[in-house]
Regions:
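Short glycine-rich anion-binding loops that position phosphate/pyrophosphate groups of nucleotides
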Residues: 59-62
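Conserved acidic residues
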Residues: 52
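Conserved active-site segments centered on acidic
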Residues: 1-45
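Phosphate-binding/catalytic loops
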Residues: 65-127
Length: 127
């Protein structure tokens, strides 16, 4: 969402709904993004939505992702699961921060390569 601005509708969903992980909330707050009020969504509730892209970020999600609309490009990027990291709270937060940074790098590149080319150069004039 951050890198695409208003140029794209962005959804986040998983194979099941669950409470937002507090390490994820803390990690995102450290990056000045408040996700504390967001709710998780089940991908099954979005199967009637037409998507240009569906991006899966773990191998389990890739295997469970339902078929989407025709023309939808599926992209898979496997990020490590920070929930799998044991140790102290500091170790766990560090794992979330590393994955957050990896996802940020991917999101920036994805928007630059796939979304920005679709935006007319004179977008300000069209608004």
């Amino acid at each position: 969402r951050y890198y695409s601005g208003n140029a794209a509708e962005v959804y986040s969903a998983g194979d099941e709904s669950y409470d937002i992980n507090m390490f994820a909330v803390k990690s995102m707050m450290d990056a000045v993004l408040d996700i504390s009020h967001q709710k998780t969504k089940n991908i099954a509730k979005l199967t009637d939505t037409d998507f240009d892209f569906v991006i899966t970020v773990c191998d389990e999600a890739r295997a469970m992702c339902p078929e989407m609309n025709e023309g939808c490009r599926k992209i898979h990027v496997s990020f490590p699961d920070p929930n799998a990291v044991g140790g102290s709270e500091e170790d766990k937060l560090m794992a979330f921060n590393m994955v957050r940074d990896d996802i940020e790098d991917f999101a920036f590149d994805f928007v630059h390569n796939n979304i920005r080319p679709l935006i007319p150069e004179n977008i300000e004039e069209l608004i």
